[in-house]
């Protein structure tokens, strides 16, 4: 299931303002925005100030119409283009912010490393699952941190895959994912340890720039 909304809400529970941005480029895919809507968190119609402890999400069109048009090309040709890499680097926030992003293919690690360094960005980079920034709950990936472009390896990838994550559903539909998210936030189900670790890394980075 898509766990990016859960990651965002766990961070908000710790007092951070959290913004998710993106758009649909595949017809059948469950998006983080779908799950957030099911949790009664409506999309922003335009950029606005996000309060501490708030999760907001916004369509790429409202941040950069040209980039949204480029991303939409995938629905025509069926392939990703450079816009999919650019959108993962976006920091649409005024003031200090941590960009949380991920790569799927290992060869992108060096490229993203060089980009964050040259642009002086503050970011957390890890290997994601199916294009999502939330970590695979069954594994602990490598984490690379960047503060004003300065790199630090936080954690190497841990070997092995968890045979089971308590309470994690096998279904990936919107309703099931939203209900799982509710149950974890309510304490009825445990936070997956891998996701809790990711939250810790983000909180530590945020503390360095606050």
Over which residues does each language-model region extend?
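A generic, well-ordered mixed alpha/beta core segment in the N-terminal half of proteins
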Residues: 1-51, 56
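Glycine-rich anion-binding loops and their surrounding alpha/beta cores
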Residues: 38-41, 49-210
């Amino acid at each position: 299931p898509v766990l990016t909304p859960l990651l965002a809400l766990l961070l908000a529970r710790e007092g951070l303002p959290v913004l998710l941005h993106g758009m649909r480029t595949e017809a059948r895919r469950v998006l983080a925005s779908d799950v957030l809507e099911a949790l009664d968190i409506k999309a922003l119609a335009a950029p606005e100030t996000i309060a501490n402890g708030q999760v907001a999400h916004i369509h790429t069109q409202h941040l950069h119409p040209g980039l949204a048009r480029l991303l939409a090309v995938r629905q025509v040709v069926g392939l990703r283009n450079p816009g999919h890499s650019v959108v993962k680097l976006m920091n649409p926030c005024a003031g200090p912010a941590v960009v949380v992003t991920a790569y799927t293919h290992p060869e992108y690690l060096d490229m993203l490393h060089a980009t964050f360094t040259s642009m002086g960005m503050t970011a957390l980079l890890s290997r994601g699952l199916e294009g999502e920034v939330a970590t695979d709950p069954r594994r602990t990936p490598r984490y690379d941190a960047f503060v004003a472009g300065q790199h630090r390896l936080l954690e190497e990838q841990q070997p092995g895959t968890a045979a089971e994550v308590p309470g994690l559903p096998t279904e990936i539909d919107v309703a099931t994912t939203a209900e799982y998210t509710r149950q974890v936030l309510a304490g009825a189900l445990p936070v997956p340890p891998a996701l809790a670790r990711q939250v810790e890394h983000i909180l530590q980075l945020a503390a360095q720039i606050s």
